[in-house]
A protein has these predicted regions:
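Bacterial N-terminal signal peptides
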Residues: 6-20
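Short, surface-exposed beta-strand/beta-hairpin micro-motifs centered on an aromatic residue
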Residues: 63-65, 70-77, 416
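Positively charged n-region of N-terminal signal peptides that target proteins for export
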Residues: 1-4
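C-terminal functional module detector
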Residues: 24-25, 35-44, 48-51, 58, ...
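A short, Gly/Thr-enriched small/hydrophobic beta-strand-prone motif that recurs across taxa
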Residues: 22-35, 127
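Catalytic cores of extracellular degradative/oxidative enzymes
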Residues: 122-306, 316
Length: 508
């Protein structure tokens, strides 16, 4: 009897404790509005308690340290101090705030978000090429990040959502009449790296593939034959990048990729080609290595557009953190966006908002002149930033040739110094922030110069990829002789291709 009394008393104390906690729970209503129109807008919210623990409303899409809402959310939280950051992509200023919740209190806050710039009104439309989020959440995620194009990866090596789920009538879906999501994108990520397949008309099953076999080319070649497919190299430093470039079957490459994150960098190359830590040290080194490889590709005469992807749903990023703005002018559509991306009419960013023109043309343009003539190019730039940017940079043929302080840029009325070309080459414009935790920047796509009908092909850049391929072949890990021969034949063919490029080189 005594034992039962003790148990009953203990349970009573627990119940009273739970009731006390419930009674102390406070309620706060947050409404997010556009500061100018006062209209409610979807947004992303990062909310922490005093211990740094994330607040996670159970009914809203949540990932890592944030959730999204349609613009109004009711939160039930214990007493204490809270801080928050509210964002809607880079086109709105981040709103920082805090509140103290008293026991049983009811509070409300209206949070105005200030729009810095409406890129779509200027003809630039944002997309993220690397999304791993639940399909049912993507429409709200797009609205909360002000994203216009969202290809969602639903098949990925051993994972294939459509083995159990019924395929939709159309893989392309329209969100609030002006945004596009596609539900059949795929990813082949194995020992050679990752290729992203977009605009797929159907699912392509790659679940039979193992880490080392078959070659990524085994899937790339038949997929490339499908009408309208867009193939993206997910990161420049993947081991098979020279192979994929040699194939002529890729359309873009992830200059801003998932190693660049909102609050940190993944400062390694995973299982890709490692960087020289002396040349590319510290937090920014991995991002600079991605740029270096991309510039070497351009220096071999290949014209491949830069792209951007966040890998939200796998890594910590929100959807759209790394984004590519594609210029469509007044002709924005699903197909136009992808076609213009392929043509390089792009700016990639995870922070600064940049709208560059060179001699009145958007990125991707090819300026031509006859042999013996020269071309003078002048860039004009509209720039909006939240993080501090000390310099604007003009990169020509892989080297920074101009560092323009922001105050000088302002005095010049948005004009940058002229660049004279006496031989073929390329240039782009870059704005790197002083953020010390991550590599935050914006880069235009390249502007190309072709004099005398030939592209600039660097011997050193081409040799860089030949050496890379030789190193890659030494890393093939297959004991089965037939499988090994099957994989190596693609590298041998790619090496022959690069040797031919080397023979055609016209600069050191």
């Amino acid at each position: 009897m005594f034992r039962k009394t003790i148990v009953f008393a203990a349970l009573t104390l627990i119940s009273l404790g739970e009731l006390t906690l419930v009674a102390q729970i406070g309620v706060i209503d947050l409404q997010i509005v556009d500061s100018e129109s006062k209209q409610q807008i979807p947004a992303r919210i990062h909310l922490w308690d005093s211990t740094g623990k994330f607040v996670h409303p159970p009914t809203l899409p949540f990932w890592h340290d944030h959730f999204v809402c349609k613009g109004r959310v009711r939160l039930r939280v214990p007493p204490g101090d809270y801080r928050f950051e509210i964002e809607r992509g880079p086109e709105y200023r981040i709103h920082y705030g805090n509140f103290r919740m008293l026991p049983g209190a009811r509070e409300s806050k209206v949070i105005p978000l200030q729009r810095i710039l409406d890129m779509s009104k200027k003809g630039w439309y944002a997309g993220d090429l690397h999304i791993h989020r639940d399909l049912k959440d993507v429409p709200l995620l797009m609205q909360a990040e002000d994203l216009y194009v969202a290809p969602v990866i639903t098949w990925w090596n051993q994972k294939n959502q459509w083995l159990n789920d019924e395929l939709p009538e159309s893989p392309l879906q329209v969100v609030d009449e002006k945004r596009f999501m596609h539900v059949l994108s795929g990813e082949d990520e194995r020992d050679g790296g990752a290729l992203l397949y977009h605009k797929m008309p159907e699912v392509f099953d790659i679940t039979e593939g193992t880490k080392h076999y078959p070659s990524s080319m085994h899937y790339l070649m038949p997929i490339r034959k499908m009408p309208g497919v867009h193939v993206d190299i997910e990161k420049p430093f993947w081991w098979d990048t020279p192979l994929w470039i040699a194939s002529g079957m890729v359309d873009s490459i992830g200059l801003l990729n998932s190693h660049m994150q909102r609050k940190k960098m993944l400062s390694n190359e995973a299982w890709g080609k490692e960087r020289d830590l002396k040349r590319f040290p510290g937090v920014h080194g991995n991002g600079q290595w991605s740029q270096e490889i991309y510039y070497q590709i351009l220096n071999t005469g290949h014209r491949i557009a830069p792209s951007a992807g966040s890998a939200s749903g796998v890594l910590d990023n929100p959807v759209g953190y790394n984004r590519v703005y594609v210029f469509c002018g007044e002709e924005f559509s699903w197909d136009t966006w992808w076609e213009n991306l392929k043509q390089g009419k792009v700016v990639v960013t995870n922070g600064p908002l940049m709208r560059p023109l060179v001699n009145g043309k958007v990125p991707g343009h090819v300026f031509t002149a006859e042999q013996g003539e020269s071309l003078t190019l002048q860039a004009t730039l509209s720039l909006a930033v939240q993080d501090k940017v000390e310099y604007l940079e003009i990169v020509r043929d892989g080297l920074v040739i101009e560092n323009i302080p922001l105050d000088e840029y302002a005095k010049m009325g948005g004009r940058l110094p002229e660049v004279e070309f006496k031989q073929s080459g390329w240039m782009l414009i870059r704005a790197v922030t002083s953020n010390s935790k991550t590599y935050r920047l914006a880069s235009s796509g390249p502007f190309y110069v072709e004099i005398g009908g030939s592209r600039r092909i660097s011997k050193a850049a081409t040799q860089f990829f030949i050496d890379w391929l030789k190193e890659r072949q030494e890393l093939v890990q297959l004991d089965d002789p037939q499988q090994r021969e099957d994989v190596l034949r693609y590298y041998i063919a790619a090496e022959k291709y690069w040797e031919a490029v080397l023979q055609a080189s016209n600069v050191d």
